[in-house]
Amino acid sequence: MEKSWFNFLFSKGELEYRCELSKSMDSFAPIEKTTDRVIYDTDKNLYDWGERSSYYNNVDLLVSSKDIRNFISDDTFFVRDSNKNSYSIYFDIQNQKFEIDNGLSDLEVFFYSYRSSSYLNNRSKSDNDPHYDPSIKDTKYDCNNHINSCIDSYFRSHICIDSHFLSDSKNYNESYIYNLICSKSGKIRESQNYKIRTNMNRSDLIKDFDITQNYNQLWIQCDNCYALIYKKALKFKMNVCEQCGYYLKISSSDRIELSIDPGTWNPMDEDMVSTDPIQFHSREEPYQNRIDSAQKKTGLTDAVQTGTGQLNGIPVALGVMDFQFMGGSMGSVVGEKITRLIEYATTEFLPLILVCSSGGARMQEGSLSLMQMAKISSVLCDYQSSKKLFYISILTSPTTGGVTASFGMLGDIIIAEPYAYIAFAGKRVIEQTLKKAVPEGSQAAESLLRKGLLDAIVPRNPLKGVLTELFQLHAFFPLNKNEIK
């Protein structure tokens, strides 16, 4: 049975992360009663490693065994408070055990010998750390920073806690995670003067891509700050990095799930697939093979999903492009599906939402892909000008090329996500063509908003509420119960 060992520094004696320590030996009652709790040993005590004779007794768990299984299967954590009191916490999910010990082991010596320069205040390790072992090489500590960042990310994502970074040392950044304990009423209260402190060397994390690849089934790395994010928690965070706020790409299926009320989504034209109309020649990979591999990778037939559903009870027609399918490129199938969606919305007098995420027209289909720009713009003109219906365009990163030049910028209301890359031609193409440098950030959503090309920049979390208010402002209201078919 393999164990993993992690080193944590707790800034308060009471360990409140998912459990609460009671100083009373007589009281033992779960804080949150659940039918599926982790089995714990009531005889286990947390003894003080200092000179005091007091100790903490009994652990009341706030997490079910189901939650822990999603996190970790068999692991041991070393915990130390601000008074250098040290404890060992062991999880064995298979046998449903949760044990806390205070026995010093070689592994504890190994991890406790790891100190940052600011924590030691530039003093000698041998003078300040009784457990310091000079025979242990510093190279062994590289994985500790990586694992600390993994657990650090999980704490924030699954336990309703927030964080910010402070840097008071040249050698490392300290991550102070402020614990928010969820009360029974569902409200979040902040535990006063409590924080979990982990040491994380950001430069080591950026360089250590090999370790990240070994855990890629559990963690995903932010493209901006290179922080590790727990994959299962990423969906609940709407694919937003909790460290730097960077907006990671989100699949079309996940976006539909976030936007449309459960059980109301009705897809359209799912059986429409691309062919090779111009017999495009490629030295690397045939066009049809690329389509087949993209279909296997995404589970989609092409780079857009269209259909109807309800957004907070309001019937809408929705089209969502998926960048994972050949860069969200617009071919004949994408153009036809969007055209049919607009025509259906025109007939049924539905408000229209198109979520753009595309690299532009699909070059493998030549002029057939370019004509989709005119075809979609034509039906949009009838939808907006003749029928006086309401179209919202949502631009995500990246939105470029033919999509930007056509329906992407034709919305009655144009909304962009924060930091979205929106352009007609990419930075590299412009610089190679015009021989001029493109200013940094000039193609970001914030720059376009200042220049009047966008109506608003809305984060993912409040987007559904903003869309609801816009629809109600334009006289689109939720269906009554009697009107729901």
Curated annotation (Swiss-Prot):
Swiss-Prot/TrEMBL GO biological process terms: fatty acid biosynthetic process; malonyl-CoA biosynthetic process
Record carries keyword Calcium: no
EC number from the UniProt entry: 2.1.3.15
Zinc finger (C4-type) in chain: 222-244
GO molecular function: acetyl-CoA carboxylase activity; ATP binding; carboxyl- or carbamoyltransferase activity; zinc ion binding
Gene3D superfamilies named in the record: 2-enoyl-CoA Hydratase, Chain A, domain 1
Annotated residues for binding of Zn(2+): 222, 225, 241, 244
Primary subcellular site in the record, as a coarse category: plastid
Needed co-factor(s): Zn(2+)
SUPFAM superfamilies found in the cross-reference section: ClpP/crotonase (SSF52096)
Catalytic activity: N(6)-carboxybiotinyl-L-lysyl-[protein] + acetyl-CoA = N(6)-biotinyl-L-lysyl-[protein] + malonyl-CoA
InterPro entries tied to this protein: AcCoA_carboxyl_beta, Acetyl_CoA_COase_Trfase_b_su, ClpP/crotonase-like_dom_sf, COA_CT_N
Pathway annotation from the record: Lipid metabolism; malonyl-CoA biosynthesis; malonyl-CoA from acetyl-CoA: step 1/1
Pfam family for this entry, one: Carboxyl_trans
Subcellular location: Plastid, Chloroplast stroma
Note describing how the cofactor binds: Binds 1 zinc ion per subunit.
PANTHER family, alphabetized: ACETYL-COENZYME A CARBOXYLASE CARBOXYL TRANSFERASE SUBUNIT BETA, CHLOROPLASTIC
Record family assignment: Belongs to the AccD/PCCB family.
Subunit structure: Acetyl-CoA carboxylase is a heterohexamer composed of biotin carboxyl carrier protein, biotin carboxylase and 2 subunits each of ACCase subunit alpha and ACCase plastid-coded subunit beta (accD).
HAMAP family per the UniProt record, alphabetical: AcetylCoA_CT_beta (MF_01395)
Described function: Component of the acetyl coenzyme A carboxylase (ACC) complex. Biotin carboxylase (BC) catalyzes the carboxylation of biotin on its carrier protein (BCCP) and then the CO(2) group is transferred by the transcarboxylase to acetyl-CoA to form malonyl-CoA.
Protein name stated in the entry: Acetyl-coenzyme A carboxylase carboxyl transferase subunit beta, chloroplastic
Organism annotation: Aethionema cordifolium (Lebanon stonecress)
